[in-house]
Amino acid sequence: MLLLMAFVAWVLTAVPPEGFPILEYHMVTENPRPDAKPYVVPPEDFAAQLDYLKAEGYETITMLEFSKAAKGKGNLPEKPVIVTFDDGYEDNYTQALPLLEERGMKGEVYVVTNFIGKKGYLTWDELRDMQQRGIEIGCHTADHLPLVGLSRAEQEDQVRLSKLLLEWNGIKTVFSFSYPNGSCNAEIAALLRDSNYLTAVTGDAGFNTFQTDPMFLQRVNIPRPRFGLTEFRLRILKAELFSIFGINQHLQH
């Protein structure tokens, strides 16, 4: 174990990554649904993770800021990080947002449009308020169905109608997408481009650079921690190592 830790430390020192992490959260609450526990981070753990990021010099950015910088239309901080939330749970508004605001941090919420207003999920008013307070809203389809198994017509409905519904209800132009269950391929990525999306996030572990295909951005999944900040740091380290060794890398051609 000591030899492994020494090797990892040497790799990170010898080959510093040029990328940055995108964190993947779902629920931030003390009282999750019984079936949702693996996807829940208690508020105190979430706050500690945010404090760790700040102490390490990370600064939060939005997906749109990343897209603009990738096209030479802006600059990123020295250590950027994007904090994302999938599904659109109401605790993203009641629990996560205040903790982000206390630290001057931003986030991205990927919404399943047919869940909006249902018990435990964000309402339209909450979404619009989050947007006004610096949270970027992205799309997570209409029904949270894995896209690869759907017909072309169903894929188009899930990708396009959900985007239009968000924009019709007062959400600024939606540029970013999250694949339900990480279900994606080149054909779906092309559909997203044709539908005027600029970025899409997967469930693959890794860091991202301007060379990463923006339709296959990698993330660091953050489930309910069992070992506190140690586990959080190790998950970021794992993504870092995946990038160093070229695992799960989707590069532009």
Model features per residue range: what roles?
Residues L97-M105, L122-C139, R193, Q211:
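Acidic (Asp/Glu)-rich catalytic clusters
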Residues F7-T84, E90-D91, G149-H253:
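C-terminal active-site subregion of NodB/CE4 polysaccharide deacetylases
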Residues M1-L3:
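Hydrophobic H-region at the start of alpha-helical membrane spans
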Residues S67-A69, N92-L97, F115-R133, R160-L161, ...:
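Alpha-helical scaffolding within the catalytic cores
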Residues Y89-E90, D143:
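Short, glycine/acidic-enriched loop or turn micro-motifs at the edges of active sites
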Residues T113-G117, P146, P180-S183:
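Short histidine/acidic/glycine/proline-rich micro-motifs that form metal-
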Residues G138-A153:
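Substrate-binding clefts and substrate-entry loops adjacent to catalytic sites
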Residues P21-E24, P38, P42, E59-M63, ...:
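Short, well-structured secondary-structure segments
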